[in-house]
Swiss-Prot record:
Protein name in the entry: Hydroxylamine reductase
EC number: 1.7.99.1
Residue numbers bearing the Cysteine persulfide modification: 405
Cofactor binding note: Binds 1 [2Fe-2S] cluster.
Cellular component terms (Gene Ontology): cytoplasm
Binding, hybrid [4Fe-2O-2S] cluster: 249, 273, 317, 405, 433, 458, 492, 494
Keywords: 2Fe-2S, Cytoplasm, Iron, Iron-sulfur, Metal-binding, Oxidoreductase
Family: Belongs to the HCP family.
Localization, UniProt: Cytoplasm
Predominant location: cytoplasm
Amino acid sequence: MFCVQCEQTIRTPAGNGCSYAQGMCGKTAETSDLQDLLIAALQGLSAWAVKAREYGIINHDVDNFAPRAFFSTLTNVNFDSPRIVGYAREAIALREALKAQCLSVDANAHCDNPMADLQLVSDDLGELQRQAAEFTPNKDKAAIGENILGLRLLCLYGLKGAAAYMEHAHVLGQYDNDIYAQYHKIMAWLGTWPADMNALLECAMEIGQMNFKVMSILDAGETTKYGHPTPTQVNVKATEGKCILISGHDLKDLYNLLEQTEGTGVNVYTHGEMLPAHGYPELRKFKHLVGNYGSGWQNQQVEFARFPGPIVMTSNCIIDPTVGSYDDRIWTRSIVGWPGVSHLEGDDFGPVIAQAQQMAGFPYSEIPHLITVGFGRQTLLGAADTLIDLVSREKLRHIFLVGGCDGARGERNYFTDFATSVPDDCLILTLACGKYRFNKLEFGDIEGLPRLVDAGQCNDAYSAIILAVTLAEKLGCGVNDLPLSLVLSWFEQKAIVILLTLLSLGVKNIVTGPTAPGFFTPDLLAILNEKFGLRSVTTVEEDMKQLLSA
């Protein structure tokens, strides 16, 4: 096992990465190794997808499957080894079908990629794990060095984050052939184990640029189906009655659940990154969507154990449900998996609803505590002139985007302390689950404009980018000249691709934490600092002083 993709990876003087029987996320060495094997199979599939496009062949089954299966290897998504192997087998079957399509056009069709003809050696998980050793990401570290390995992983993990957003967009009916062609090209190239530093740096920026387009179609999918988010108050306390909790990012799953629970007497609560759903008109119209429950994903083992109903996980993040003994009432959807828990294959939530009706639910309603979400792209753009006016009248000094992933590391208190230290004449724009560090606190307003503005899920960084570009255009300056600073927390691969997106767009002087990714070497950090001004957090006092004086 070698995995260094998330923030909580093991870090030692000898090197970084989880390489024992189990990773810090709870992933076993078996599952981790089989995920490496799956990625190799997906690289071979993408290699043939690139070749097929040369013949004008676009196989939508391949395009739909490839990013979804890659998503299953993201942190805290799928811990179920047999399902990972199932994805690998499906990848190979689709590859062979695509290869046959190419051969039907050109009998001499050939794909010159090391992964293009990969076959699984056995049905036995142990044998497959041994085969997977050929594809462990650091297998040639001694030959290529830490810097090249780090850049490879930056590209692989960044592309994995983009694949997750591609799947979210696909679920909502969004497809862009150019994006999929670019995805397959990059995925196939990474399967050649590239070792050119400049080419890898260029690839990282290409992934960021591609992801901006992915976030655009995802935004279009969400707003077309569910309307543009508008500011909405959400209760974060319990309401009497039977209940279901839904976590993750998939708004379509939430909509289906709300439709199927309507009139059943079962209330629905959002958790984690599902919180922004309350801002969408077509979702909040359901009166039994009663509130948001819990805090950051890392606290779920305590909070889920206390929730008096079933729980549905639609995407990341799931962690071991046996710890809180709620594994008999947690359900996984789509690419999510945990050994031994119930998995919903389709869109029928009937079994979950039936379980909710058999459980006690909340015995009484607590005194409401309301927070505000729903500052989507249209709302943010509608406030652009107000922001400019406040800046011109020196009522608004600075905007801080404080957001990103949450996690368990104690140093993440930095983001709470930073938010509460922001001066009263400054605004905090937030997104993703890092907001749970401070989103239940009171920040007041500036002439009626809330000082804490929740823009949505991690992918809604797109809205923040569009706002920044709009403000820069209106003020006749560059984005980097705005009174705007980005203070971002990271945990997994979606955060990595958001960072690459920002860097590829030329955004500079981003501050990140609580630690640097484990695959970043000192040399890579120095390169990113020199090119983009990217740096790690220090202390709240020093960072605040520097950002306000920039």
